Amino acid sequence: MSLEEKVKNIIVDKLGVEPDEVVEEASFVDDLGADSLDLVELIMSMEETFDLEISDEEAEKILKVKDVIEYIKAHT
């Protein structure tokens, strides 16, 4: 399973959205309906799955699906 597929599966699981809604340009808040608690849980899941730590400052910059994919690629 590719990194993108793993990220997509986590987003589908945590936000309860359809897989076809999770495209790279999708905004977590505007397109996928996430609230601040959802975003915290999403970041925690990414940290656990990919064994990395995302600072609060960095997490605030992760607004779209592509942002989290690019962050993980750069830090793993």
From Swiss-Prot:
GO terms for molecular function: acyl binding; acyl carrier activity. Keywords: Cytoplasm, Fatty acid biosynthesis, Fatty acid metabolism, Lipid biosynthesis, Lipid metabolism, Phosphopantetheine, Phosphoprotein. Pathway: Lipid metabolism; fatty acid biosynthesis. The modification O-(pantetheine 4'-phosphoryl)serine is found at residue 36. Disulfide bonds: none annotated. SUPFAM superfamilies: ACP-like. One of its GO terms (biological process) is lipid A biosynthetic process. 4'-phosphopantetheine is transferred from CoA to a specific serine of apo-ACP by AcpS. This modification is essential for activity because fatty acids are bound in thioester linkage to the sulfhydryl of the prosthetic group. Signal peptide: none annotated. Belongs to the acyl carrier protein (ACP) family. HAMAP family: Acyl_carrier (MF_01217). This is Acyl carrier protein.
